[in-house]
Amino acid sequence: MSELDPNRVVLSPAQKARRINQNPDLYGTFAEIGAGQETVRHFFRAGGASQTIAKAMSAYDKDFSNAIYGPEPGNRFVCESRLKNMLRHEFGLMLERLSRKDHPTKKFFTFANTIASSTYERPHSGHGWIGVRFQTAPDRPTSDVIIHVRLHDPDISLQQESVGIMGVNLIHACFFHHKDPQEIMTALYDNVSRHVVEIDMIQMNGPDFSQVDNRLLSLQLVKRGYTDAVIFGPDGQNLQASEALYKKNILAIRGSFRPVTKVNIDMIMNGYNTVSYTHLDVYKRQGASCPLE
């Protein structure tokens, strides 16, 4: 049963993995780096994984990871760009190495995650990116679902277990609920508590989600209590706040902005000028150049 809908039947991770393994047309690769090497284990333990899993790998060493997927700006590893590069690289290898003549009915997929668990020095720092690139028909272009999670369980092993279950939920939802984005969001928390895993960003792209407004998905995250705040860009694409604001100077103005008025513009410009002058004065006293100049 679901905590949101008592009448909704919730499958266990083993049941979901087994359902995928028993489908002869689903075939894919798993790439899990960092602390998130738990998802594929559910598929191996469910039985029948040989007809589902083309490859399972973990480029755990940072140098090896960079050699495979390329370095990221700032030499980061747990970031959205790394996840997207993993999905692109691994799915590309499937198309390159598997002949469509030999697999005419297969619907390919790639699951990837890059996770940093909490440490004793930073007990609430666990977070990561999880994503699936998949086909809903053999000749259909791929669609992507990407989420960012924050891990709040104090036990590192339980953080990893939660990530593994959520990965199974995501793969299962992409294949069996791709026509209902709301159900995908609901299914992500099957057998996972919202108190231990927080989803603060979700993005659905591709032909199977051509009618999806990702901004509304962001608002759903807040409405459902999955997270406290969300951010999206002017292009309508959802952003993960710490990723989008990484090493940025931030000026925030409260308001509805419907429409944007001259008063709103004046507030922004006066606020910016105030912050700029304050920072400029501080940097000059320190004998350094101000990044806001």
Language-model features: locations:
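N-terminal low-complexity segments that are often proline-rich with Ser/Thr-Pro
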Residues: Q286-L292
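Conserved small/polar residues in nucleotide/adenosyl-binding loops
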Residues: T278-Q286
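Short, glycine-rich nucleotide/cofactor-binding loops
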Residues: E32-I33, I253-M267
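Histidine-anchored nucleotide/phosphate-binding helix
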Residues: V263-Y277
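Short alpha-helical segments enriched in small residues
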Residues: S2-D139
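A short, charged/proline- and glycine-enriched loop
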Residues: N23-D25, E243-L251
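N-terminal accessory interaction module
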Residues: L95-V192
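Non-catalytic propeptide/linker segments at domain boundaries
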Residues: K179-Q240, L245-Y246
